[in-house]
Amino acid sequence: SLDRRQSTFRLSFTDFSKKAINNYRLKNGKKNIEKYKELFQIAKSKYGVPPEVITAFWAMETDFGAVQGDIHTLSALATLAHDCRRPEMFQPEYIAAINLFSKGIIDLKTTGAWAGEVGQVQMLPSDILKFGKDGDNDGFIDLKKSPEDAILTAAALISELGWEPNQPWIEEVIIDDKNFPWKEAGFGRDRKISSWKKLGIISRNKKFMASDNTKATLLLPQGLKGPKFLAYSNYNIYLKWNDSFIYTVTAAHLASRFSGQKKFLSNKPDKILSLEKMIKLQNILQSNGYNVGKVDGILGRQTRQSVRSIQIKLGLPADSWPTDDLLNILN
C-alpha cells in the first residue's frame, strides 16, 4: 500500500516495528492461524510455506483484510501505464488487470493500493493472474472478501518466489564482544553458522535454528547498539515481496513472534538522524565520491553502504548506521 511504501522510509527499525508488531496483530494473527488451521495445513503441505509467514504478510499488508486501499484499481493502473515515468512496469499490470476484469476476478468498483495491488495480501494483477487460488472452493477467486482465497494465493506466490520448506528465515542473536568485526554485517557477506559462532555470536534461543554448515547474513537494522539478527536464505523471499530493509526485517520478526519467539531486545540504539541531518550527511558522502543514490534524506541501501565505507576509512565500528557523532566527525 501507499503507506507501506512511503511513510516507512523515514522511521527507524525500532520505531517502525513498534507500530507494525502491535497487540492487535499478535492477538488476531494467532486467532487466524487457529481459525484457518486446516487451510494453512493444506497450504503448508502443497507449497511448503508456514502459516506464520503467510499470516505476518496478511497482518502487515491489510490488518487481515481490514485496510485494503480505496483507490480504483483499473483507473489507477490506466493512469500509471500512460502517464508514469515507469510505463514498462505498469503497462503489463494494466493488461493483467483487464484480464482479471474479463474473468470476473475484479470489477469496475474494485479498489486497492495506488500501484494496483489488490486484496487482503495486496498482490499485483499479474501475480493474481498467475497464482490466484480458490481457497474456499466456491468456484470464484476473490482476494478481497475471501481470507481462504488470499491465504492459498499468498502461499502459491511465496513458494514461487523460492521459499525453501522446513528452513528458518530469521533469528535474533546476541553479540557481547566489544571488539566484534562489525564490517562483517550486511548483505552479500554471508558466512556459515560455525564461522559466526567463532566470532562470538550467540543465538537468543541458545541453540541456532540451522546447522553449522548453513549460511546466514548478519543484519543490523539499527546499528551495533540495536537489535541484531541472522537472516537465512528464506529471508530473500521477503526482499522479493518488498525491497524495504525495515519492512522485511519487521515482517520476518512478526512471523517469528507467531512461531513463539520472544520480542526482540530493544537495547538502546542511536536514534535515526533527522531529515535535515540525513540530507546533510548524504551531501557530504556524495561530495567525497560515495554513491548514496538519490539525496532524499532516506537511509536506503546505498546510503548505508556508503556509511559503512566511510566508517571503515575512519577506523570506526562499521555498522552502516549514521549517527550524530559520525556527522560531527565529517563536518
Regions found by a protein language model. Give the residues of each.
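Catalytic glycan-binding domains that act on GlcNAc-containing polysaccharides
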Residues: 1-215, 226-230, 235-250, 254-255, ...
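Residues within the helices of the helix-turn-helix
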Residues: 41, 279, 283
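Generic hydrophobic alpha-helical scaffold/packing signal
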Residues: 252-255, 282, 308
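Short acidic, glycine/serine/threonine-rich helix-capping segments at coil-helix boundaries
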Residues: 271-278, 286-330
